Swiss-Prot record:
InterPro entries tied to this protein: Ribosomal_uS10, Ribosomal_uS10_CS, Ribosomal_uS10_dom, Ribosomal_uS10_dom_sf
Matching PROSITE patterns: RIBOSOMAL_S10 (PS00361)
Protein name: Small ribosomal subunit protein uS10
Keywords recorded for this protein, A-Z: Ribonucleoprotein, Ribosomal protein
Pfam families: Ribosomal_S10
GO CC entries: ribonucleoprotein complex; ribosome
Homology family: Belongs to the universal ribosomal protein uS10 family.
Function: Involved in the binding of tRNA to the ribosomes.
Keyword Ribosomal protein (UniProt): yes
Length: 102
């Protein structure tokens, strides 16, 4: 498929798990002789939650929780049918969200 590009976006809470998954995808794409751009680290989404510690009063006593979503972007340029087939067979961990655009 000349002139085409596959864009893969990965999201996870654990950055180590995310990097392992990105490495697997890049290795598979390179083994099928496709050009790979990435993994490109995208900005981390950081969400803070502020909660009262006590159920009734003591408004000054609060607890803060944080959620971080790490993201990576991988572009596969001029993929072959072999590449697409190999990408479909990859087993990725459960904590990694994969979004693919052609």
């Amino acid at each position: 498929m000349p002139g085409q590009k596959i864009r893969i976006k990965l999201k996870a809470y654990d950055h180590e798990l995310l990097d392992e998954s990105a490495k697997k995808i890049v290795e598979v794409a390179k083994s099928t002789n496709s050009k790979v751009s990435g993994p490109i680290p995208l900005p981390t989404e950081r969400t803070l939650y502020c909660v009262l510690r006590s159920p009734m009063k003591h408004k000054d006593s609060r607890e803060h929780f944080e959620k971080r979503v790490h993201k990576r972007l991988i572009d596969i340029i001029d993929p072959s049918p072999k590449t697409i087939d190999a990408l479909m067979r990859i087993n990725l961990p459960a904590g990694v969200d994969v979004e693919i655009k052609l």
